[in-house]
Regions:
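Feature for exported/extracytoplasmic and membrane-associated proteins, marking the mature portion
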Residues: 2-316, 335, 349-415
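Short glycine-biased active-site loop of nucleotidyltransferases that positions the nucleotide triphosphate
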Residues: 132, 338-344
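Glycine-rich, charge-dense phosphate/pyrophosphate-binding loop(s)
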Residues: 318-320
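Acidic/histidine-rich, metal-coordinating catalytic segments
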Residues: 323-330
């Protein structure tokens, strides 16, 4: 969207939020000293967060992770019949029980599962699945398939948890803001590199903020809103840089940390954030061709980073306060394709990890001999059941039905 000359009278709160200004990462405002008013706002927000110390972190595996080669049903002959070339033999797996084994690259996940800190949720999906990355991800981001919902489920959750829109309540570590965190009331903190506090939309946003002094009267609602955004970005940039500058951990996250050390640094700094969102970039899990090696490598990155994240939280004494949910926009088709990969599918596995999790298997395991349309796994668990479980079971919030626009049965997943 281009800011036109009539910005003075035409800017509306909703338009700015749509633009992405709701997730500001403003390097141009960096380096400023926090004024007493800013410090008081931060202190007030921190006190609110302390009242209920539970934090939810969400990790998105973009591209469509192959759940069948992640949590492998090695005891089911149908798995190998569908995948004669890319099926993973039992003697290579990290055996969990008498039916499932993890991909050989997932040593960290094996430890978490056997320590009772990881829940595996089977058959997660929704009716009439889309095989489009964009469309299916939008459904998962909004928790509203085929609805055109404007705001993300994490953003709506933030609004319901804290209708006042407390600063720094919601953090999205990424190059650009996810639909999942789009909110009516909250200004998500969106950044990629803490030292620069910059992301892809920075230059557009900097231009908009440069116009703030020209928006007329201080009582003008548009001016006040832009100034609130600028103030929020200024406060957040200082907090993020200080937190990252003070972070010094001996924990090894492996090759790709998936931005999880940044989350730990913010938690350890006392940032009042309740909801964090991180993700893989560039549809990394879209494994159409010669899948096995690249898929194992990606799962190793994920497993190493997530297990390190839990250890790092234990180091700072916050492991009991944090749950991590892991999802992908769809699974892969059950049969392998002719290029030794897999194509876009439907139902998939999800994971919830943390010290407060009752580890084990949840949901009905899909039947590999009774496939859905297109040789896909038939979903057995509506993914919103998992969201509802996190909202009510982990965060202790009773507004899940309103947020998700429906009643979804929860799992008894938390200690």
């Amino acid at each position: 969207m281009t800011l036109k000359s009539n910005l003075t009278t035409r800017i509306k709160r909703r338009e700015i939020l749509r633009k992405g200004m709701a997730g500001l990462g403003v390097a141009g405002l960096g380096g400023a000293i926090l004024k007493p008013s800013a410090l008081s706002r931060v202190a007030e927000a921190a006190a609110m967060a302390e009242a209920n110390g539970k934090i939810l972190v969400i990790l998105e595996l973009s591209g469509g992770n192959d759940g069948l080669n992640t949590v492998v049903p090695y005891a089911d002959d149908a798995y190998y019949q569908h995948r004669p070339e890319i099926g993973l033999p039992k003697n290579q797996l990290r055996i969990l029980d008498d039916h499932f084994g993890l991909n050989p690259g997932m040593a960290g996940f094996e430890r978490l599962f056997k320590d009772g800190k990881m829940a595996i949720l089977h058959g997660c999906g929704y009716e009439n699945p889309s095989y489009s990355h964009f469309t299916s991800m939008a459904y998962w981001h909004t928790a509203a398939p085929n609805s055109g919902q404007e705001y993300g489920w994490v953003g709506r959750l933030a609004d319901d948890l804290d209708p006042s829109g407390t600063s720094n309540f919601l953090v999205n570590i990424a190059a650009r803001q996810s639909l999942a965190v789009r909110s009516k009331q909250h200004v998500p903190v969106v950044f990629d590199q803490p030292s620069r506090f910059m992301r892809e939309a920075f230059f557009d946003e900097k231009e908009a903020l440069s116009r703030v002094p020209d928006i007329g009267n201080v009582d003008n609602p548009s001016r006040r809103f832009l100034l609130d955004i600028a103030r929020s970005a200024n406060d957040a940039s200082e907090l993020v840089r200080d937190a990252w500058g003070n972070y010094n951990s001996p924990v090894d996250y492996g090759v790709n940390s998936l931005d999880l050390p940044k989350v730990v640094s913010l938690i350890d700094s006392g940032m009042p954030t309740k909801l964090y969102y991180v993700s893989y970039r560039n549809n990394a899990f879209d494994t159409h061709v010669f899948q096995n090696n690249v898929h194992r490598r990606l799962l190793t990155y994920t497993s190493d980073a997530v297990s390190a994240f839990i250890r790092d939280l234990e180091r700072i004494g916050r492991a009991d306060d944090v749950a991590l949910m892991i999802f992908s926009e769809f699974g892969r088709r059950v049969p392998e394709n002719v290029t030794l990969g897999t194509d876009h599918g439907a139902a998939n596995v999800m994971f919830v990890v943390g010290n407060g999790v009752k580890g084990g298997h949840y949901g009905e395991v899909p039947n590999l001999t009774k496939l859905a349309k297109g040789d896909n796994l038939a979903y057995t668990t509506d993914f919103r059941r998992v969201y509802q479980t996190l909202i009510s079971g982990w965060l202790g919030h009773g507004g899940g039905s309103k947020i998700l626009n429906g009643d979804f049965e929860t799992f008894d997943m938390f200690v």
